[in-house]
Design a protein with these regions (language model features):
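Acidic interaction surfaces
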Residues: 1-140
Length: 140
């Protein structure tokens, strides 16, 4: 159910949700339109339970990152793990793989030719998720 008028939320939502909105959006620092959008995309229960974590993670690592992680996992409850799981943004899984192995084992000598995409496929894809350019650890 889409809440089209911000004034009617008191008539539509449960008292617990209204109280959360009053405390955090009206008297607090959260934007009411953003909060209502979150409820539309998820649920009232998820709003009350996870919105603080969503805002915190979004401010720390970016809302696009958080939204991609939630969408990939299919449940907003995963928002509690996104900051621990996030490894960065990369143009490809191969770029992440190259950086990962260089960080762990040191620079690969320039005379060696490494197929980083094949290395991703055979090794790292089991431990990491590549989602819309974002890399997340799958062990969180």
């Amino acid at each position: 159910m889409t809440v089209t008028l911000t004034a009617n939320y008191k008539e539509v939502f449960k008292q617990e949700t209204v109280d959360f909105i009053e405390e955090n959006c009206i008297d607090g620092e959260y934007d009411l339109d953003d909060a209502l959008k979150f409820i539309d995309e998820h649920s009232e229960e998820d709003f009350v339970t996870f919105y603080d974590a969503y805002i915190s993670a979004g401010e720390n690592i970016g809302y696009d990152v958080v939204d991609a992680f939630i969408e990939y996992h299919g449940d907003v409850s995963y928002v509690e793990h996104v900051e621990d799981a996030y490894r960065g943004v990369y143009s490809s899984a191969a770029d992440f793989t190259e950086e990962f192995y260089n960080d762990v084992y040191g620079e690969v000598p320039s005379f060696l030719v490494v197929d980083w995409e094949a290395t991703w496929q055979s090794s790292l894809r089991y431990d990491f998720d590549f989602v819309d350019g974002y890399v997340f650890s799958s062990s969180f």
